[in-house]
Every structure is written in C-alpha cells, then in structure tokens.
C-alpha cells in the first residue's frame, strides 16, 4: 500500500458499534428458524435451552474475540487475525471462504427473505424469476447506499437497529399484553407449551446438533464489528463494549420472542406451518388478525434489511484489506475519491451475491430438498464454523507470540472460555457429515448438499492460493 493511498476514517462511535453487532446479528433467524427447530426437537424446554445455549455459546465467543480483535483494530477482521496467527494461507482461505460462501450466501439469503416479506405484505403472486430479479435489485440498492459513505451507512444502521429492537420487544410483550387486557378466546395459554420435555422417544445428539446449526445462523453476525474495526473510534474500549453488550441484548430478545411464539402457538401448529409463512407471522395473525400478520411481515422486512445492510457494510472491508496485502486484486484497496469507501469491493461482493441468488434459486427449483433460504444459510454456516472457531482459538497463539502486547481487555475465564466455545462447533461440523433422515425407506443425509459444495469451494481456494496468490504476493512491488 502506498503512503499516499487514502485510508479509512474512524467515524464509528460506541452506539454505532453496538448497532453494528446487534443489527447484523438480528436478521431472519429469529423469525425463520423456529420452524426448523420444531422439526428437529419438538419440545419447548429443549428449544428454549437451545436458544439460551446459543446465547451462552456466543457470549463465550465474544469474551474471547474482544481480546483478539482489540489487538488488531484494522479492516479485514478475521483475515488479519488468521494471517497473523497461522500464516498467510489461512488468512487468504478465510477471505476466500467469506467472499465465496459465508458473506455472499448470507447476503443472498437475507435479500431472498426481504423479497418474500415484501410480496407477502402486498399479497403479490410472482414467478420464481420475478422474485430473483427483485432480490437482486435489493442487493444493488444496498450496495449503492454503502458506496455513498460510512457515516451515512452507520447512521442508517443505528436507525434500522432501533426499529427492529423495538419490533422484537413488541412481539416479546404479546403474553404480557393479553395478561393485562384479557380476552376470549385468549390466544396465550401455558398449554401451548406442551410437550415440554421428550417422552420415551427422546432426542438424539444428532437432532440436537442439527437444531443448533439453525441456532448458529440466528446468532451469526455478532463478529461483524471486526471487519470495520479500522473505522471504530477508541477501538480498544468500544469493540469489547459492542461485542459483550450487543450479544447480551440479542440473547435476551431471542429468548423472550421465542417464548412468546410458543405461548401463542401449539407445537403442532408450528411444525405444520404453511409453506412460505413464518412462526412470527402466524403468531401475530392468531393474536391480532390480519393487522398482526402485516406487522410481522413488516418487522421481518426491517430486521432483514438491517442485517443485509450491515453485512454489505462489513464484507467489502475484508476485500479491501486483502487488496492491500496483494491476496486479491490490488484494485480492491482503492477508495471512492468522493465518499472514501471501498466502492469496487462493495460492487464485487454485490455481484457475486447476486450470482448466488440465481444459483440458489436454480438449485431450489430443481428439488435439492431444501428451500432457497435453508440451502444458502447451511452453506454459509459450514465455512463459518471452521474459520470463526480458528479465529477464537488464535487467542492461545497471541498469548504466546504477543505476550507483551498492550491488552486493555483480557478474556475473562481464559483458557477455559475459548476451549468451551470450540467444543460446540466441532460437534456441529461433525454432525453435518452424519445427520440423516428416512425418506420412503431410504436414508437421506440432511446436510450433504451444502457440505460437499463447501468442501469443493474450500479445495478450490487452497489451489488458488498455492498456484496464483502465493507467487503473486512474493513478487516485488513495482
């Protein structure tokens, strides 16, 4: 990077940093994944424990990640962390996986849910190609907003996050509303929580870990403060504050909202949800009629919009950092001459995400056994589980090789905190190889489509590094 190359500006304060964590974490999962959980573990106590466990798991990650990120408050996030901890190949592979799989698939999935909610609100029937075109147009508009400036994008993120948190609080307060204003028939009932515990049939570990894969998607995004850390003011203070405060707020909202869902809807109703609907929409339809369903669809749109916007804000900073290190085309490090944003990186990410919308729509229409949303989210989680766990475990490396570095924040509970965190992803990843169900007397492996696709992309990335990136990065700068 040349000395006269313009740099990113530190314009994000503590409120904007917290909004980044909360806004990119709360997206579609709290609305969409309740159905997936009911298919794997149709017992209220188990489901509630999974949501609480997901929060504890994420909090353990945040406790560790806050120390690691505060050591490297630079654009790139995990790219910089993995490169410094394990070597340049691992930094590149994270960038490759994040671009090709995690970030782009997440953006495609979120834009798809935004489109579904839009058509649901306005009751528009539309063929698949029309939905795909609308989904891509959403990505294009979001990319344009992010090109226009970091401060503008961050201010929009704070506003959207405030609205989505308020919406979730309103949903969480449904039981309280009917307690204060009872009516007949009262949609809220403790009997809806049955069955609370599994009976003789029990729940297998495979079912629990498959269910936890859905939980991982719902909590995914809390680490998105890392790629924009170069733009956070006083990062050693504000990044730990954003991570710990943001994760705590998200966990409280998730547990409260899902309790409200189950107090309103019996488990059988959730398990047999109409195609194209969500638990949130049906719960509010039962509670407040068509007006409630309309509110739920609007809340989903706003929530997904915020997560989509935050991810499109964070993702290009990784490509920008890779361009600086010559592990991606160097043009990606160029900033817009007026708005001082990584405009080319934003454009490239939006184009690839749009391509995944088309590919995912094609795979879904050809009957791969998953909805477009579930296919994209499970695909994203495969790469995320591997590399984000490596980033958490890098704390052991940095405690050794950077023992004397200034640490304004130190991981609470070290070394047990990162070790406990790493156990769950290892189990979830292993379960992706073996989880199965019976269809017409035949064993069908639940996650093999996205698993093998992920392994192929990871293998391609390894070849790209050794054949192209490593030789290119060793050439002297002209």
What is each PLM-predicted segment?
Residues 36-39, 58-139, 144-147, 152, ...:
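Hydrophobic transmembrane alpha-helices that form the core helical bundles
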Residues 332-340, 385-437, 445-450:
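C-terminal membrane-solvent junction of multi-pass transporters and transport-like membrane proteins
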Residues 130-188, 220, 243-247, 380-390, ...:
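Membrane-interface loop-to-helix entry segments
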Residues 38-46, 116-131, 151-160, 295, ...:
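Transmembrane helix-loop boundary segments of multi-pass membrane transporters
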Residues 1-46, 58-59, 63, 74-75, ...:
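Membrane-interface "cap" regions at the ends of multi-pass membrane proteins
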Residues 1, 79-83, 111-134, 167-170, ...:
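Helix-loop-helix connectors at the membrane interface of multi-pass transporters/channels
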Residues 80-81, 87, 120-124, 196-198, ...:
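TM-loop-TM module centered on a large, flexible mid-protein loop between adjacent transmembrane helices
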Residues 3-8, 47-48, 125-130, 162-297:
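Helix-loop-helix junctions that connect adjacent transmembrane segments
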